[in-house]
Amino acid sequence: MKCPFCAFADSKVVDSRPDKEGSTIRRRRECESCSKRFTTHERVEEILPLVIKKDGRREPFDRMKLVAGVMKACEKRPVSVETIERLIDRLEVQMQESGEKEIPSKSLGEWVMTELHAIDQVAYVRFASVYRSFKDITEFMSELQELLKK
């Protein structure tokens, strides 16, 4: 592992442990050149299904794209980055367990909205407003009315 401080190519692992969910491994490393310590988080590379977009295109699942969308919905809300990461981790596990080779973006969006509804209702409405592409204020108000009923 390349040192982020001096760019030396070799480092030794000082400590290694799985995270709480067991999906990543946290490693504490020490550079063999400058002796500075740094942390890495390693994840097993999994083959996730292709996402079928609304227009029929297929593209590989992009975790960072989904994280960015959820983070935008949670902007200035009391939702931690860790909560968002766990939400996306659960989604990836669900995708793996489904065994599907392709999954519609609609299914991913609905699942994220269900999760956000339980975490933060303002973030839910923000995500839904982009995901569902409300055509006018009436559709938006209808969604808010449904939220208030729950």
From Swiss-Prot:
**A single Gene Ontology molecular function, please?**
zinc ion binding
Q: Which residues form the signal peptide?
A: none
Which GO terms of type biological process are on file? negative regulation of DNA-templated transcription
Lineage, top-rank taxon, reads: Bacteria
Q: Name the keywords, alphabetized.
A: ATP-binding, DNA-binding, Metal-binding, Nucleotide-binding, Repressor, Transcription, Transcription regulation, Zinc, Zinc-finger
Q: Where are the zinc fingers (unnamed)?
A: 3-34
In this chain the ATP-cone domain maps to: 49-139
Task: Show the InterPro entries listed in the entry.
Answer: ATP-cone_dom (IPR005144), NrdR-like_N (IPR055173), RNR_NrdR-like (IPR003796)
Which cofactors, by name? Zn(2+)
Carries keyword ATP-binding? Answer: yes
Question: Does the UniProt entry include the keyword ATP-binding?
Answer: yes
Cofactor binding summary note:
Binds 1 zinc ion.
Q: Briefly, what is this protein's role?
A: Negatively regulates transcription of bacterial ribonucleotide reductase nrd genes and operons by binding to NrdR-boxes.
Family listed: Belongs to the NrdR family.
Q: What is this protein called?
A: Transcriptional repressor NrdR
Name of the gene: nrdR
